[in-house]
């Protein structure tokens, strides 16, 4: 015999509604409140190459790719199909310009780190100009509050928020 048979209807509805509310609160708490990515652009003028690494929340990227593909995407397993999908996303949302020339970045791959993914790109034989422009609008269409921190390193000097720091290794 069930305990619900002994409770008044009001209590049964209260318990049901309370349980539903708890489930909704729990499900809502799994979403994270901040949508932040980190992009690092490293330029070695002597080598004439540009290396880019981009860190994004894996669940956010999977959601974006899944909606685009119309099917579930799981980036925790590195496959050629995942590499291709991720490359297309990164190439469409991340641009690096040196001087007045947009640089074609080759997607090298990605790695998984806890709940994040690191994407790696590079360009070789790039003539360096003093002006570098980096535009990262990855996931802005997906999340209104998405933001990105961009670090630009040129010959061991890093530019962060209009200040120049010397990196010592």
Each predicted region: which residue ranges?
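Polybasic/polar functional segments that serve as interface/processing modules
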Residues: 2, 29-30
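N-terminal secretory signal peptides that target proteins for export/translocation
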Residues: 1-12
